[in-house]
């Protein structure tokens, strides 16, 4: 279902059709434990589409992701306090990929958020802040 949702396209470029498409996508990749009601999700997506919808930019980003090979060498060069946060319920990027990223960054900490998918719904913000704020305090000490 994830690949099908990623490869799907809106019925047209009309804002409502684009919003429908992204509601379907976020329903597949979203956080199962931080559910956003469809009306709220649709309103947020429609506001974003109305503000700035650039399908060519989205396609460029997808092509860049697919063309990329590895950043392993670059990750080893990071020299600042690093926290890698990953959703345990992310259907798009496996948890092991987030763990691998953290392992490759010297001194990095890894935190997996239960019930978080490949999105940032309002409900997950508190869970992220619980791990992010202590990290920021330690980094600035």
What are the language-model segments listed below?
Residues 107-141:
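Catalytic active-site module of serine/aspartate enzymes centered on a nucleophile-bearing elbow/loop
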Residues 91-97:
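Conserved alpha/beta-hydrolase "acid-adjacent" motif
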Residues 1-73, 80:
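Alpha/beta-hydrolase
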Residues 79-80, 107:
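Active-site acidic short loop of glycosyltransferases
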Residues 76-77, 103-104, 134:
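Solvent-exposed polar/charged
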Residues 25, 93, 120:
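Hydrophobic/aromatic residue at the end of a short beta strand that borders the catalytic acidic motif
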Residues 78, 84-86, 90:
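Short beta-strand/loop motif that positions the catalytic acidic residue
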């Amino acid at each position: 279902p994830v690949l099908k949702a990623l490869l799907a396209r809106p019925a047209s470029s009309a804002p409502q059709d684009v919003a429908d498409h992204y509601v379907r996508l976020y329903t597949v990749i979203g956080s199962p434990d931080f559910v956003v009601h469809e009306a709220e999700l649709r309103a947020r997506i429609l506001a974003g589409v109305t503000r700035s919808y650039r399908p060519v930019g989205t396609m460029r980003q997808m092509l860049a992701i697919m063309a990329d090979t590895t950043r392993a060498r670059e990750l080893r060069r990071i020299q600042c306090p690093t926290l890698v946060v990953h959703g345990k319920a992310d259907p798009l990027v496996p948890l092991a990929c987030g763990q691998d990223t953290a392992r490759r960054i010297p001194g990095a900490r890894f935190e997996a958020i239960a019930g978080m998918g490949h999105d940032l719904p309002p409900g997950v913000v508190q869970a992220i802040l619980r791990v992010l704020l202590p990290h920021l305090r330690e980094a600035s000490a």
